Amino acid sequence: CYIQNCPLGGKRAALDLDVRKCLPCGPGGKGRCFGPSICCGDELGCFVGTAEALRCQEENYLPSPCQSGQKPCGSGGRCAAAGICCSPDGCLADPSCHDEAAFSQ
């Protein structure tokens, strides 16, 4: 499950465990899921609501929490690609996400 929308028991347990990276997605598996319909990678940019992001729906059914991206940004989001901040609800342009170390992988 995405850490922001895990069931309470799962989210509480997440504080004690290492949060894993969300499922890989996109061409060649080079992206990471950021939400049920969002797949982003530093070389790919972001796919929102496209075939490349279909695999990201599987994450909703996995019990352990996941989080993609290194650097927090926006309102509960993480840097997903150059200049892009994503949360499970969507993506926005964010100049703080231009640092290469902030990308998804």
From Swiss-Prot:
Disulfide bonds join 1-6, 22-66, 25-39, 33-56, 40-46, 73-85, 79-97, 86-91. One of its GO terms (cellular component) is secretory granule. 'GKR' has been placed at positions 10-12 by homology with the complete sequence of the other precursors. One of its GO terms (biological process) is response to external biotic stimulus. SMART domains: NH (SM00003). The modification Glycine amide is found at residue 9. InterPro entries: Neurhyp_horm, Neurhyp_horm_dom_sf, Neurohypophysial_hormone_CS. Neurophysin 1 specifically binds oxytocin. Oxytocin causes contraction of the smooth muscle of the uterus and of the mammary gland. Acts by binding to oxytocin receptor (OXTR). The lineage of its organism: Eukaryota, Metazoa, Chordata, Craniata, Vertebrata. Interacts with oxytocin receptor (Ki=1.5 nM). Interacts with vasopressin V1aR/AVPR1A (Ki=37 nM), V1bR/AVPR1B (Ki=222 nM), and V2R/AVPR2 receptors (Ki=823 nM). This is Oxytocin-neurophysin 1. GO terms for molecular function: neurohypophyseal hormone activity; neuropeptide hormone activity; oxytocin receptor binding; V1A vasopressin receptor binding. Keywords: Amidation, Cleavage on pair of basic residues, Disulfide bond, Hormone, Secreted. It is found in: Secreted. It holds the Pfam family Hormone_5. Belongs to the vasopressin/oxytocin family.
